[in-house]
Amino acid sequence: MLRTYQPKKRHRKKVHGFRKRMSTKSGRNVLKRRRQKGRHRLTA
């Protein structure tokens, strides 16, 4: 049976990366929340 998670570095960055988050208003809100929460890693 096919495993559902087949990691790709490029896809991970493109979908969940910092620049992707910064490119939309809601993405910036995600970063803001994670900063507020005190996450050491903001994005993938």
From Swiss-Prot:
Recorded superkingdom: Bacteria
Cellular component aspect of the GO annotation: ribonucleoprotein complex; ribosome
GO molecular function: structural constituent of ribosome
Coiled-coil spans in chain: none
Biased composition, class Basic residues, residue ranges: 1-23, 30-44
Entry-linked InterPro entries: Ribosomal_bL34
GO biological process entries: translation
Keyword Ribonucleoprotein carried by entry: yes
Pfam families tied to this protein: Ribosomal_L34 (PF00468)
Region Disordered: start-end pairs: 1-44
Keywords: Ribonucleoprotein, Ribosomal protein
Family: Belongs to the bacterial ribosomal protein bL34 family.
Protein name: Large ribosomal subunit protein bL34
Species classification: Bacteria, Bacillati, Bacillota, Clostridia, Thermoanaerobacterales
